[in-house]
Design a protein with these regions (language model features):
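C-terminal and late-domain segments of enzyme folds
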Residues: 1-183
Length: 183
């Protein structure tokens, strides 16, 4: 890894769109969204990083992404991963190296079609929960849509798709579920 963009307070401040736009503007292939109370321990000599703290780190791989910022804006083929505390990934290609979670794909816990929408009326508001509970740990779902509406009434649709390369891992610590989700 020679470079990448970092954004902080990522999930709490809903900065996915901001990081994607910055990556498109700068041509950066990799983006790192670090949640509150979370750090990323980088070991350049080992080409690896580990998530520390209470939150997750969101990895964006725009190697094959296509952008169009007309009306409506479009970002396609952007790969997203969410890495839980304690898990490690390789810096050069953002591949998961190890996780304490149990694999979910192929042995999904949930089997109900998730509600497509946005806002406080939906469960699983955090990105790791949405992608974990509603997509990769759910055998009734291959696509998840989330809608955001601004004060002017403009709607942003985020469409997440489970591919053959997607993987999910779950673990529980006390009353908190942790999901690691890749691609």
């Amino acid at each position: 890894l020679t470079s990448g963009l970092v954004d902080q307070h990522f999930d709490r401040k809903a900065r996915l769109g901001r990081l994607v736009r910055a990556m498109a503007a700068t041509g950066q292939a990799h983006g790192f969204g670090i949640d509150e109370d979370t750090a990323l321990e980088v070991r350049l000599g080992e080409n690896s990083a580990r998530v520390l703290g209470r939150g997750s780190v969101t990895l964006l791989d725009a190697t094959h992404a296509r952008y169009g910022f007309g009306s409506p804006a479009l970002v396609a083929d952007l790969e997203i991963s969410v890495i839980a505390p304690g898990d490690r990934f390789r810096l050069s290609d953002l591949e998961l190296l190890n996780t304490a979670g149990d694999a979910t794909v192929g042995k999904e816990y949930f089997g109900d079609q998730p509600l497509q929408g946005g806002g406080m009326a939906l469960a699983n508001l955090r990105l790791d929960q949405s992608l974990g509970h509603d997509l990769l740990d759910n055998d009734a779902s291959r696509v998840l849509k989330r809608y955001s509406i601004d004060e002017a009434g403009r709607v942003l649709v985020s469409r997440f798709t489970q591919t053959d390369r997607s993987a999910g891992y779950w673990r529980n610590e006390g009353a908190r579920d942790h999901y690691t989700v890749t691609r």
